A protein has these predicted regions:
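Generic secondary-structure signature for well-ordered alpha-helical cores
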Residues: 11, 15, 176-179
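Primarily the HKD phosphodiesterase
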Residues: 57-115
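HKD-type phospholipase D/PLD-like phosphodiesterase module
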Residues: 102-140
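Short acidic/glycine-enriched loop/turn segments that link adjacent beta-strands
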Residues: 79, 132-134, 153-154
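Generic beta-sheet signal
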Residues: 98-100, 129, 147-148
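Basic, amphipathic "hinge/linker" alpha-helix immediately C-terminal to the N-terminal HTH DNA-binding motif
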Residues: 1-13
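Amphipathic alpha-helical interface segments
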Residues: 139-189
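Helix-turn-helix/homeodomain-like alpha-helical modules used for DNA recognition
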Residues: 14-65
């Protein structure tokens, strides 16, 4: 019994160490993660010699073929994210994206044509959160991602996985953010 507890403790310490860069910017959203979920996830961090590693991992996960369902949260405006979402949007893709008011305003200013095209798509729902968002997430066709951003909104790390426990946890994070958002059409000025 003591040995089993020690083994669990050791696994927890090893997981926390492996996830330290992610947890430095995303610890709060992980507080309610079910035991063992973080240990099932891959981690990708930015490094001096590979500062875009998390972004590249995101692009690999999203791919470039149409997906069935795409649900995401983003605290930033990114041409790369916009283009990757556009690449996987097919005729039958169900897509939801939650952003905060700041991201909405920056999107409308920086990418007005893309913003209008997205608004015209029947299968795309843009939702606006009242509270400022400080992490990102994505659930796409059985794969889940949570991304961490520093105080300057730079993507520092992401964790991802496709086990049922991981996908379920990230879906619950998504639903918790979504439940506090409204479709853009119902947004009060």
């Amino acid at each position: 019994m003591v040995h089993e507890q020690y083994e669990r403790f050791t696994e927890t310490v090893e997981c926390a160490d492996r996830m330290s860069e992610f947890l430095a910017d995303a610890a709060e959203i992980c507080e309610d993660a079910p035991p063992g979920v973080l240990g099932q996830m891959n981690i990708t961090t930015a490094a001096d010699n590979d500062p875009h590693a998390p972004l590249n991992r995101y692009l690999t996960i999203v791919g470039n073929e149409p997906v069935d369902r795409f649900r995401g949260v983003t605290p930033i405006v990114s041409r790369v994210f916009n283009e990757s979402a556009e690449a996987v949007l097919g005729e039958n893709t169900g897509m939801e994206l939650v952003v905060d008011r700041g991201v909405l305003e920056r999107s409308m200013d920086a990418y007005p044509d893309s913003f209008e095209r997205a608004r015209e798509l029947d299968q795309f729902e843009l939702r606006i959160a009242e509270e400022s968002l400080d992490f990102g997430l994505l659930v796409v066709d059985g794969h889940a991602v949570v991304s961490a951003y520093d105080e300057h909104n730079n993507l520092t790390a992401l964790v991802d996985g496709d086990t049922p426990e991981v996908v379920s946890w990230v879906e619950s994070l998504y639903e918790s953010v979504r439940s506090k958002s409204v479709p853009i059409d119902r947004l009060e000025p």
